[in-house]
């Protein structure tokens, strides 16, 4: 369904996603002003699009679905299930580009398809980690082989992720113990295990930083911001590639 206003909106949103993904990758922070230009352009273009297409078959369903999905994203962000930047990205996409202007309509909406595509693409991360660790000869529990890599102790604070080893010192000897898989949900979410805490609150982490400096390597989980696969998923969805459609075609 080609629509010039929708194409302009899609271009603005895609450029915003690329900028936000880059910021999130480099600093794990997305500046609030990043969203403003696309929100204004997308808002105007979305109104023009709906004025032209609101009476076509299925338009009301798409509009209601877009509004419901945006509301759910806001709710999930409030409940801590999404990051604020991720929620803003999905709300912007859902409202500003309800359908792709560059391909046939994909079920159920562009935003949903982009999110599902992102989930599928994210599966490459554990495969990459496992392959990398096997090639390098790194050894750790299997779950960690699929989710992390070893880093020099002195550089851990510059990584993005969670410490996957507990480091202690007894009688001048450094001892390391892997976090058990059944404890990861609670243990790895501890602020004191987050590498960002080591950077931003060094005075509180002085003891941990001192121990890490003495370690040759320490295992750290690999943190990939959702905005990175989400942006890739959006690019695929914009041109009609939808994992949702593929899965439904296999099942039906």
Predicted feature locations:
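A membrane-topology feature that recognizes alpha-helical transmembrane segments
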Residues: 1-252
């Amino acid at each position: 369904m080609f629509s010039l206003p929708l194409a302009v909106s899609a271009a603005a949103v895609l450029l915003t996603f690329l900028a936000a993904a880059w910021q999130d990758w480099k600093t794990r922070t997305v500046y609030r002003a990043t969203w403003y230009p696309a929100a204004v352009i997308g808002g105007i273009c979305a109104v023009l699009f709906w004025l032209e297409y609101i009476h076509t078959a299925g338009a009301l369903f798409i509009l209601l679905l877009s509004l419901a999905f945006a509301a759910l994203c806001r709710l999930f962000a409030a409940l801590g299930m999404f990051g604020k930047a991720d929620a803003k990205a999905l709300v912007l996409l859902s409202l500003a580009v309800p359908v792709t202007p560059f391909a046939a309509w994909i079920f159920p909406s562009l935003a949903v398809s982009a999110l599902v595509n992102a989930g599928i693409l994210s599966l490459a991360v554990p495969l990459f980690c496992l392959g990398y660790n096997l090639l390098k000869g790194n050894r750790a529990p299997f779950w960690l082989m699929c989710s992390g890599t070893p880093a020099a102790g002195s550089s851990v604070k510059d990584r993005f992720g969670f410490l996957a080893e507990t480091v202690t010192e007894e009688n001048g000897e450094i001892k390391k113990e892997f976090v058990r898989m059944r404890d990861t949900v609670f243990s790895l979410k501890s602020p004191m295990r987050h590498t960002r805490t080591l950077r931003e609150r060094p005075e509180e982490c002085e003891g941990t930083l001192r121990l890490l400096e003495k370690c040759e390597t320490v295992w750290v989980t690999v943190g990939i911001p959702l905005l990175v696969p989400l942006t890739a998923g959006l690019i695929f969805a914009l041109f009609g590639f939808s994992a949702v459609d593929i899965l439904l075609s296999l099942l039906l």
